[in-house]
Amino acid sequence: MGPCSGSRLGPPEAESPSQPPKRRKKRYLRHDKPPYTYLAMIALVIQAAPSRRLKLAQIIRQVQAVFPFFREDYEGWKDSIRHNLSSNRCFRKVPKDPAKPQAKGNFWAVDVSLIPAEALRLQNTALCRRWQNGGARGAFAKDLGPYVLHGRPYRPPSPPPPPSEGFSIKSLLGGSGEGAPWPGLAPQSSPVPAGTGNSGEEAVPTPPLPSSERPLWPLCPLPGPTRVEGETVQGGAIGPSTLSPEPRAWPLHLLQGTAVPGGRSSGGHRASLWGQLPTSYLPIYTPNVVMPLAPPPTSCPQCPSTSPAYWGVAPETRGPPGLLCDLDALFQGVPPNKSIYDVWVSHPRDLAAPGPGWLLSWCSL
């Protein structure tokens, strides 16, 4: 026997492109559903018409204009309008042409004397129960009787204004930092570096403000890769950095220590709100750099390089092993919201790559 002429060996045929596409999911919860019966809403729009009668299409358009809930993709309410017009005795059909009573496009009128009083009041819906539980006053009228029976003009409820901006940590902490971000704090004047300007003029440095008077979000440029001659940190010169990024604006208070010039203690100063957050919540992309805290009382006084104020880049010290503190006392100064990859720095220049003879005091990096 020969092979069947109708059989084919090959991939199955693709589905026909004539199939209708899938309908997207409807969203019904944009506006509050009016807590009225369909009878009350139909009677309201009919009585508001100049001739006190409307066609079915006009009733649907007027209900959409008065109640924003019915402007969405939901279409089932139109069938409820048709059902209430034909099932309630208070609605009567007014033929457009008396000779053709069965023709389409007829008008509908309402006999207000046949409307039950309870049908015009607020219904026991989830919206009304939410108002009662929350103690809030609803935007809908409690009774539509004065508008339907006495012809008072009905004003639709106004929707609440949309929020100006989305939720962000920055909005909770006082905005983006432009201007005066904290009440009562004066903006910080930028210090004039020594040696800048004309050679014949002497630069006058601006005295820095105390930590309690510094703005919440001052910005300063990062140090460039060039070497600063004559500048020393804890007795050692800073070498040229090959890892320094391009100059850009960085938060100054996140890069500065809490020590105040003049030897005063910063224990009574309020910590910055941005410094108290994990680095993943900062509004700009920064490395894991956090604001240093005051040394805890459990830190070892004989080895200052292991206290939190000196974490970052510290000079290599050669001493007996007995001077080192245990890890429990060392990590008691670490806030609970910091990870082991966060680095404590006490000076903006600490972001530069360390020179020879320097080491990172926190070895878990």
UniProtKB/Swiss-Prot annotation:
Nucleotidyltransferase recorded as keyword? no
* Tissue specificity comment: Ubiquitous.
Gene3D superfamilies in the cross-refs: Winged helix-like DNA-binding domain superfamily/Winged helix DNA-binding domain
TM spans (from-to): none
According to the UniProt record, one GO cellular component term is: activin responsive factor complex
- The record's region (SMAD-interaction domain (SID)) falls at 273-354
Q: Write out the GO MF terms.
A: bHLH transcription factor binding; cis-regulatory region sequence-specific DNA binding; co-SMAD binding; DNA-binding transcription activator activity, RNA polymerase II-specific; DNA-binding transcription factor activity, RNA polymerase II-specific; DNA-binding transcription factor binding; nuclear androgen receptor binding; protein domain specific binding
Region annotated Disordered sits at: 1-29, 151-215
**What is the name listed in the Swiss-Prot or TrEMBL entry for this protein?**
Forkhead box protein H1
From which source organism is this entry? Homo sapiens
Q: Which gene encodes it?
A: FOXH1
